Each structure stands twice: as structure tokens, then as C-alpha cells.
Design a protein with these regions (language model features):
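Single conserved hydrophobic/aromatic residue that forms the stacking wall/gate
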Residues: 1-20
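Transmembrane alpha-helix boundary signature
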Residues: 8, 12-14, 49-61, 76-91, ...
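Residues within membrane-spanning alpha-helices of integral membrane proteins
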Residues: 15, 41-44, 66-69, 73-76, ...
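Central hydrophobic cores of alpha-helical transmembrane segments in multi-pass inner-membrane proteins
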Residues: 21-22, 39-54, 125-129
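Short aromatic-rich membrane-water interface segments that cap or initiate transmembrane helices
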Residues: 21-35, 97-117
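Hydrophobic alpha-helical transmembrane segments in multi-pass integral membrane proteins
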Residues: 30-51, 64-69
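Membrane-interfacial loop-to-helix junctions in multi-pass inner-membrane proteins
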Residues: 49-73, 134-154
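Conserved, charged catalytic cores of large soluble enzymes
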Residues: 85, 89-91, 96, 121-143
Length: 154
């Protein structure tokens, strides 16, 4: 949306030629394809920050990152084959259907990413729980490692 090239199907179908940059940015997650792309981006960021800041029990860290990576891989396959946001437009839309009016409000435009931070944040908690079950070591140390990530997601 920011490049102003006007060739993507998402852009043309929404008719975003004359809206502000803020609204163009919120138009990225204004449809299914963009929402899935945002979901993957947040998954990758949580995976990165977890691997960066989690220093206790390396085996938990490795298993958690592996489970997160499997989720990233699955969502990436889904987005590439079934819901591609980078698909070039085959239609010549004159003006499109426009941006969802709800996303034109500044606070409601940031609502989906903030909501996704919580949803996707709990995927890290899920991955850590799977790692704990695999290692059969769910104890106080496990809980102390996962506690800040639960608070971040919440």
C-alpha cells in the first residue's frame, strides 16, 4: 500500500487511491489475506524476542522455538497457497469497494494489531507448554520462565 504502485489485487479491490497513509497501512489488515500476513509477522516477532530474552533451560527454549517455527511454517504455507496477499490483480477495478469504514477511525485501525498481539502471544505460551510436556518438567522454574510471556500476551 505504501509503494503507490497500484498493481496488487488487495489495493485495487479496496480502491485506496485517495486515502491517508495511516488508512492505507490499516488497509493491510483490512482483509483476510492481510490479517494472515500480520498474524505471521507477530508470530515471527514473538519467536525472535523469546529466543533473544529467554536464557534459562536451553532445552525448553529450543523446543519452544521449534514448535513456534512449525506454526510459522504452517501459516506461511497456508498464506502462500490459499490466501496470497501478493497476488497480482487480474481485474481492472475502477474504484474498488473502499476501506472498511471502521478502519478509518484511528483507534479502531490499531485495534486488530493489538488484539493479534494477545492472540498470537498465547501461541508462545502454548509452544512452551508443549515443550514442558515433551521434557516432562513442568515445575516452578517452568512457570517462572513463562510468567512474563503470559503477562505480555494478556
Amino acid at each position: 500500500f505504501q509503494a503507490e504502485d497500484g498493481i496488487r489485487d488487495v489495493e485495487r479491490s479496496r480502491g485506496l487511491g485517495d486515502v491517508y497513509k495511516r488508512q492505507k497501512l490499516s488497509g493491510v489488515w483490512g482483509n483476510h489475506e492481510g490479517s494472515m500476513l500480520l498474524w505471521i509477522l507477530i508470530l515471527v516477532l514473538f519467536n525472535f524476542f523469546f529466543s533473544l530474552f529467554s536464557l534459562k533451560r536451553k532445552i525448553f527454549q529450543n523446543l519452544t522455538v521449534s514448535v513456534q517455527s512449525l506454526m510459522i511454517f504452517g501459516f506461511t504455507l497456508f498464506i502462500l497457497f490459499l490466501s496470497n496477499p501478493f497476488k497480482l490483480s487480474e481485474n481492472n477495478y475502477a474504484d474498488g469497494i473502499g476501506l472498511n469504514p471502521i478502519l478509518q477511525d484511528p483507534l479502531l485501525a490499531i485495534h486488530p494489531p493489538v488484539l493479534y498481539l494477545g492472540y498470537v502471544g498465547f501461541s508462545l505460551v502454548f509452544s512452551f507448554a508443549i515443550a514442558g510436556l515433551i521434557c516432562k518438567e513442568i515445575d516452578k522454574t517452568w512457570a517462572s520462565i513463562i510468567k512474563p510471556w503470559v503477562f505480555i500476551a494478556w
